[in-house]
Amino acid sequence: MLSSLYRTRITHLSRTPVHHYFEQGGYSWYVDVDELPRLPRWLEPFARFEAVDHLSPPTAGPDTLRARVDHYLADRGVDLPGGTVTALLQARVLGYVFNPLSIFWCHDRHGTLRHVIAEVHSTSGDRHAYLLPPTGAQPAAVKKALFVSPTDETDGYYLVRAPLPDAELAVTISLHRENKPAFVATLDGTRRKASIANVLRLQLVAPLAPLVGAMWIRLQGVTLWTQRAPAVREAPIPEREKVGQL
């Protein structure tokens, strides 16, 4: 599979504890974890992929992104030998990376999509991966487990719709409490070839995208605080990489 890029638009809508909306442009890589992009040396600082940025390391063998995905699945009783794993994620830019959401689509050896891993990262450095069934028209439900905001508890459950991307990317995640949506996020994008020209172009239209994305999310937290959103006193410590289930 040839790697590709998605020029993306992210939207966040909070309905409680205060009403707040923002959107941000950026881009994401779509890759085969067994065939990560190889760029010219002079371009590598703007697109470097590191296994350490995702999931947990394997207990034995080389520490690669594929090994981390296999380890995560095996730890949950899932064995997909020989199957393709594609991922939507951010690459390191000048050594920095921030992945609010990384998604892995895990296929069996016959090419059938069997599982989806959605890994959420917080600006404080915590992360938690959720194992989901394939999602199409119907979203998958999973309990929220990671503390991602000083104004938001870990109660409630997510509805996640993450169909396998094609020419268009369309991911939706909504947080529900008392059967009502408290928060809705979308990630939409249009597919582009991962050419040198497109990589360079995206550095101009979305420079330092991972750093800007992290700063933008922190700024939204400050905005919520100025709107008198109540702060959560103690952040629950997540069980890293534990699968969430209803």
Name every feature range the model reports, one short phrase each.
Residues 1-246:
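Mature, function-bearing regions of proteins
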